Amino acid sequence: MGESGSGKTTAMRNLPSKETFYIDCDKKGLNWKGWKKEYNVENKNYWSTDSFSVVSSLMDKVDKQENFQHIKYLVIDTLNGLMVAEKMRILAMQSGDKRSAWSDLAQNGWALINKALTLRDDLTVIILCHSETISDDNGIIKTRIKTNGRKLEKLVLESKMTTVIWSVRQDGKYKFILSADGSTCKVPMGSFDTDECDNDIMIVIKALEDY
């Protein structure tokens, strides 16, 4: 998780493109030189969509289809891109049950996280999210995954995740925060000796190989 411009997408730069399927839910492309040669429809490792149903279908394909078994990393960038797009579609509804549609938004977000937990064991799912820093009724400040809708806020998406990393830019340097008071970031016990590391998802994946 991280604010816009904190290096979330850039942190994916060292993933092996031949073993990675990238779902671009923000529809803005990736942000390192030469990415279009690595990730494209022709290579069957890139798709741009802001539809929950399409993302769910792609997850099923990567998980089960024989011609996708070489894929070891699945990136969803970002969950917020899906939620915001769905929110805009609901707001544009001229008819229908908007209350039900808002419930569907929360259900779709929760279902996507749950589906990620059920995919094959040799597939690492990386879900990028925006972060927000809020103050609760007691004045306690916390940084967490930004969600759309009160139902998802109450559910706490991080509770379904084994690892939550906070991408930040401090003093001109991009890095990952692995553990910090007042945040929901977390890594398995013993996986790191420090509370931060370089902005590179492969460092995290390597550290988690035994978990």
Question: What does each of the following model-derived ranges do?
Answer:
Residues 17-20, 120-123, 159-163:
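Short glycine-/polar-rich loops that comprise or flank the Walker A/P-loop
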Residues 1-75, 80-81:
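Conserved P-loop
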Residues 73-155:
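P-loop NTPase motor core
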Residues 125-198:
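Phosphate-binding/switch region of NTP-binding enzymes
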Residues 33, 86-87, 171:
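Hydrophobic alpha-helical membrane-insertion segments
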Residues 11-14, 65, 116-119, 154-158, ...:
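A general structural signal for short secondary-structure junctions and capping/turn motifs
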Residues 194-211:
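Charged phosphate-binding loop/patch that engages nucleotide di/tri-phosphates or the phosphate backbone
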